[in-house]
Amino acid sequence: MAAYYLAVDIGASSGRHIIGHMENGKMVLEEIYRFENGMVKKDGELCWEFDRLFKEVVNGLKKCKEIGKIPVSMGVDTWGVDFVLLDKNDNVLGNTVGYRDHRTEGMDKEVYKAISLKDLYARTGIQKADYNTIYQLMAVKKKHPEYLEQAETLLHVPDYFHFLLTGQKTCEYTEATTGQLVSPITKDWDYELIDMLGYPRKMFQKLIMPGTGIGHLSDKVREEVGFDLEVVAPATHDTGSAVLAVPANDDDFIYISSGTWSLMGIERKEADCSEKSCEMNFTNEGGYAGRFRYLKNIMGLWMIQSVRHEVNDAYSFAEICAMAEEAKDFPSRVDANDECFLSPDNMTEEVKDYCRRTGQKVPETLGEIATVIYTSLAECYAKTAKELEEMTGRTYSRIHIVGGGSNAGYLNELTAKATKKEIHAGPGEATAIGNITAQMLKAEEFKTIEEARTIIHESFGVKVYK
């Protein structure tokens, strides 16, 4: 009988439980449970509902029992940078504030009193983003110093769910690197940096690598769901899992992990922490097996998702793509990475305002708005591809687009045209596939990453755009 492996993949807008197993030499997936996610306002702060989300994680486990497909292991992956602080009784200190909250405004200046941006990049190789853990912790230090005094443990979001499942406190490496407090040389916390910033050392747990067994379900969870399994750390940063699932058998490719965010980059063995890399705003996030994801964060499909919500989700993404294609000659462009698009009150109005401010034709219809966003994204991808080639001295022949955004056919066509490269789109479920792959590698279903990627290609295929 085939062994089942469970990926719990929680994104910024939804979470899913996806079961995977091997059948006739191919990986087979089944989504068995889905739930909503999103930030809510609490005490004037944008917060995640972790208690509710954990109930949903458990509900999905109960569903496994219900359908008679009990996994041998599971792992949770989420977005990066966000965390909880626990006191000595393992209670959460303060609100579970999310990365789109404004509490980090001005915190970069506070950090730079201790270390310059240039030196910080040289130490960590992580691109500056106001929501990084390093700045969020500074916000806690300035606004709630008592939390840092009481804190015994810092856990990033997937680590917190693994703790609630098993009672074991761990910090997984790929997720930790997103926060800008890990050394790419030692692949451990940069304790000297942590001391410089006045963050308590004791909060930071030992880092573990993806593929590490964390433990079995706690008695409480086991009784509730009716079975036991091993919790295995995948690359818990969702992009780390998605990149593991890129269906390539060589290194002649750029990838885009396309979802709420677009993470565009390459895999490399060593980090590039040079001044030029810093100026170009590339980041060196941790990957599976000690590799680095050398990439750039691009706003991604967040803009389209927001616009869709503003018309009450009346249209599918495919329908919006079709409308955009009809308005394809609309001339205006926006900078997809402009801060104004990070958390606006109304994305549609923000796009119009940007065009107004920059003296361009203002889009009016949904199709025009969508074509401005898609075309701007494709041009941003083309610019980033050129920068990657400049930084590495290489020319890449193709771009692999994985994740939910790989289904946006119109955007893929625009990207092929803008980059003049072959686009290989798929698999759409890359994050869950990568999560399951890390578990399968631990269980020796595959011997190497290369074998796993070949099987992923054979199992799910790709759609090529030229």
Residue map of PLM features:
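Glycine-rich beta-strand-to-loop/alpha-helix junction loops that act as flexible
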Residues: 77-82, 210-211, 258-261, 398-406
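Active-site core segments that coordinate phosphate-bearing ligands/cofactors
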Residues: 6-7, 19, 112-125, 135-156, ...
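Short acidic-aromatic active-site loops that bind/stabilize oxyanions
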Residues: 46-54, 126, 130, 207-211, ...
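Carbohydrate-associated surface elements
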Residues: 101
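Short glycine-rich phosphate-binding loop at a beta-alpha junction
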Residues: 70-78, 153, 206, 394-403
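Short beta-strand-loop/turn "lid" adjacent to the catalytic site in phosphate-handling enzymes
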Residues: 66-98, 127-131, 162-183, 206-209
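N-terminal glycine/serine-rich phosphate-binding loop of ATP-dependent small-molecule kinases
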Residues: 1-94, 122, 150, 222-231, ...
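A conserved helix-loop-beta module that forms one wall/lid of the active-site cleft
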Residues: 191, 197-211, 436
